Regions:
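C-terminal engagement/docking regions of AAA+ P-loop ATPases
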Residues: 1-27, 37-53, 225, 230-237, ...
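Walker A/P-loop NTP-binding motif of AAA+ ATPase domains
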Residues: 3-224, 230, 242
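Amphipathic alpha-helical interface segments
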Residues: 241-245, 249
């Protein structure tokens, strides 16, 4: 378990591209009620911070980044709860650890308790599961929303359980009931992918040259088109691989000319071009055709659940 101060979290909402609608809903539904309770409760007793928020969708779409930014922007104390923290070999010790987590959260409130891959620790209860696992889930739910969940003056505690998963169907129904705010973070559509490209490449030198036929050497529209089916993480890695191509070329040219590598200068490296994304080591090239189609099919189960959100349903295009 890690207790993190908001100032120690380096991620803000400005660092996340393509999820503006979800970010605005998180501000209105979580941050403001959590940090300005007097404003919301003074208007209506219904306007309290939610007891739980669930971010679900395919891997690499920004769920963990949203959680970090939410903790930073809210100014609330952030508890990063690892699954291993709740696991002990002695009978009953895991229950005590759960109670200790909530005791700390109450003393530090407003608090956000983040559980990544929440389905692994709070999955569906089954008749054949180990007794200790069932007791941990029962203790967690009791501390979260039970007789001891209110403050000493009878008010609502300002503790928000924030979970992230790509297997929402495996989470116990009682847990889902305690998480009234659910946000699908699905694969980005064209406009979202463009925002991700713009944000990722904002500090990268771009080749502004125009070809003889009028096409730009760096065509972001082409990248947006062929990256359909890629997650935000995939796009970032593709940009990272592409940004290395001009540097690799410059180093190779220096070696061939016999010049001293100590004299290498960053300003002599050419700008990024569209072709850098499709070379032998280009990130998009590696995800194109069969590999990308297999990846997309493997995500269908989660994608169907998340399709009600702002995700992409576009067909993947090949780049010739």
């Amino acid at each position: 378990m890690e207790v993190v101060s908001p100032g120690e979290i380096p991620v803000t909402f400005e660092d996340i591209g393509g999820l503006d609608e979800i970010i605005e809903e998180l501000r209105e539904g979580v941050i403001y009620p959590l940090t300005l309770p007097h404003l919301y409760s003074g208007h209506s007793s219904l306007l309290t911070a939610p007891s739980g928020v669930l971010l679900y969708g395919p891997p690499g779409c920004g769920k963990t980044m949203l959680a970090k930014a939410l903790a930073r922007e809210s100014g609330a104390c952030f508890i990063n709860l690892h699954i291993s923290t709740l696991t002990e070999k002695w009978y009953g010790d895991s229950n005590k650890l759960v109670a200790a987590v909530f005791s700390i959260a109450r003393k530090l409130q407003p608090t956000i308790v983040f559980i990544d891959e929440i389905d692994a620790v709070l999955g569906q209860r089954r008749s054949g599961e180990h007794e200790a696992s069932g007791m941990v889930k029962a203790e967690f739910m009791t501390q979260w929303d039970g007789l001891t969940s209110a403050t000493t003056d009878g008010g609502n505690q300002r503790i928000c359980i924030l979970g992230a998963t790509n297997r929402i169907q495996d989470i116990d129904e009682a847990i889902l009931r305690r998480m009234p705010k659910k946000f699908p973070v699905s694969l980005p559509n064209a406009s979202q992918r463009r925002q991700i490209f713009d944000l990722t490449l904002k500090d990268t030198r771009i080749d502004a040259t125009v070809c003889s036929d009028g096409r730009p050497v760096f065509d972001i529209s082409a990248l947006v088109r062929v990256s359909a089916g890629m997650s935000g993480s995939d796009i970032k890695e593709a940009c990272r691989d592409a940004a290395m191509v001009p540097v690799r070329e410059h180093i190779k040219a220096l070696k061939q000319s016999g010049r001293n590598m100590r004299g290498i200068r960053a300003e002599n490296v050419r700008g990024l071009q569209t072709e850098d994304f499709f070379g032998r080591r280009g990130g998009i090239h590696q995800l194109q055709q069969q590999d990308l189609k297999k990846t997309t099919r493997s995500r269908d189960e989660v994608h169907e659940v998340a399709s009600a959100g702002s995700g992409s349903t576009e067909q993947v295009d090949d780049f010739d």
